[in-house]
Regions:
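Terminal export/targeting leaders at protein ends
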Residues: 1-155
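Membrane-inserting effector segments that mediate pore formation, membrane fusion
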Residues: 142-217
Length: 217
């Protein structure tokens, strides 16, 4: 397993070991806590030597991400190198039927993926759950709130950017991790963030576990 230079993954080299912990666990473990059969990170000597000081082998972590989206035989032909993160991201989007432009930036495609996950989750929520979510996210008039209305609210949040967009991203990532590896992010949020996470985690988990079976990672 070798790292292929990727400008979209270079930021990993600026992260601290504790910040990389959740990512490493997600890459190496299944929902039941067992080590993934297809991962190579934990078998690497550099990993064994420095774990859990993840920042000392961030390139191996990046390489593991790249290998998620690569065909095993093709990876061997490429000298053990996987594919760039954008290709991994687009492969996930294709299998989850996300509408995106392949010429868009990684950030834009990631945003489309997040909105797809949110949209599918909202469509699975009951009117009572939608109302509770609307209240938790600060919507003033929650009477007759629909999934379409909440999609519009979240789209506006992402377009506006800033801290609310960051919070919403954390909520989605937290729910995705819970669905994939059985645990969320190692962080403590404020009351509103925690409440919104609790409301969304179930529906997002249903979406992710239903669609992830089609994705070979």
């Amino acid at each position: 397993m070798a790292y292929r230079y990727d400008s979209d993954l270079e930021f990993l080299g600026q992260m601290k070991s504790e910040e990389l912990g959740d990512l490493v666990y997600c890459l190496t473990h299944d929902r039941d806590g067992s080590v993934r059969l297809t991962e190579e990170l934990t078998m690497n000597e550099l990993y064994k030597q420095h774990h859990p000081d993840h920042e000392k082998y961030w390139e191996l972590i990046a390489a593991e991400i790249q290998c998620f989206g690569a065909n095993t035989f093709a990876t061997i032909l490429r000298g053990g190198k996987g594919v760039e993160y954008k290709e991994v991201l687009m492969d996930v989007c294709d299998k989850m039927k996300v509408n995106y432009n392949k010429d868009s930036s990684v950030e834009k495609i990631e945003g489309n993926l997040l909105m797809k996950i949110l949209t599918d989750a909202l469509e699975k929520m009951s009117p009572e759950e939608l109302k509770e979510l609307a209240e938790a996210t600060g919507v003033k008039n929650t009477s007759g709130i629909t999934a379409e209305t909440m999609v519009g609210v979240f789209q506006a949040v992402f377009r506006a950017g800033g801290f609310k967009s960051y919070q919403l991203t954390l909520i989605v990532v937290n729910a995705v991790l819970k669905a994939l590896i059985g645990r969320g992010l190692s962080l403590a949020g404020n009351a509103a963030l925690t409440r919104t996470m609790a409301i969304l985690t179930g529906p997002i988990g249903w979406v992710i576990t239903g669609l992830w079976t089609a994705i070979d990672i």
